[in-house]
Curated annotation (Swiss-Prot):
This is Transcription factor FapR. Transcriptional factor involved in regulation of membrane lipid biosynthesis by repressing genes involved in fatty acid and phospholipid metabolism. InterPro entries: HotDog_dom_sf, Thioestr_dom, Transcription_factor_FapR, WH-like_DNA-bd_sf. It comes from Exiguobacterium sp. (strain ATCC BAA-1283 / AT1b). GO terms for molecular function: DNA binding; DNA-binding transcription factor activity.
């Protein structure tokens, strides 16, 4: 059954408000219309393309990263609350995959998660001392990986326990428990 244009546009706007990272291709499948129709609807509704939406969300939700430069974070960081939680988005492109099967290289998913765990630390020196990681399924060319990190415990020994879960859509594709060393204020003097 075809949904009338006004109703589709209302639902499109709600969907994008709920998930600003959704791609036009996914929206076209969800609403059973062409990608061009989705783009025209977005233009009429003055909704920017996904990359602009990601930048907008990021500009509103970022503390200043202390432990890394932003160029060292793998993926686009869109949310950061130091010593609490962080989110990054990585679109899997040709340079991230094996050429023969278009499956993402494991070290790319690890690098996204590890750099997010380190960036989360509210200290100028933060280093990974331990990582226990699990890959749940293959990630393919063109998929979007959303990594979510949260601090589980600030220990008294200068270490912080961080958990990172990475998703494609609603499906968890990677998770890891990281122990991050932080220098601490007393050692900076």
């Amino acid at each position: 059954m075809r949904v009338p244009k006004k109703e589709r546009q209302r639902l499109l706007q709600e969907t994008i408000e709920h998930n600003p990272f959704i791609k036009d291709e996914e929206l076209s499948k969800q609403f059973s219309v062409s990608i061009q129709t989705i783009r025209l609807d977005r233009m009429e509704l003055k909704i920017p393309e996904v990359r602009e939406r990601i930048k907008h969300v990021a500009s509103e939700h970022l503390d200043e990263v202390k432990s890394l430069s932003m160029s060292e974070v793998i993926g686009d960081m869109i949310d950061l609350k130091l010593d609490d939680s962080a989110i990054s988005v990585l679109d899997i492109e040709k340079e991230h995959v094996f050429s023969r099967n278009e499956i993402a290289r494991g070290h790319v998913l690890f690098a996204q998660a590890n750099s997010l765990a380190v960036a989360l630390i509210n200290d100028e020196l933060a280093l990974t001392t331990k990582a226990d990681i699990r890959f749940s399924r293959q990630v393919h060319l063109g998929e979007r990986v959303v990594a979510k990190a949260r601090v589980m415990k600030l220990r008294g020994d200068g270490r912080t326990d961080v958990t990172v879960e990475s998703y494609v859509g609603e499906e968890c594709v990677f998770d890891g428990d990281f122990t991050i060393y932080r220098r601490g204020e007393e050692e900076q003097a």
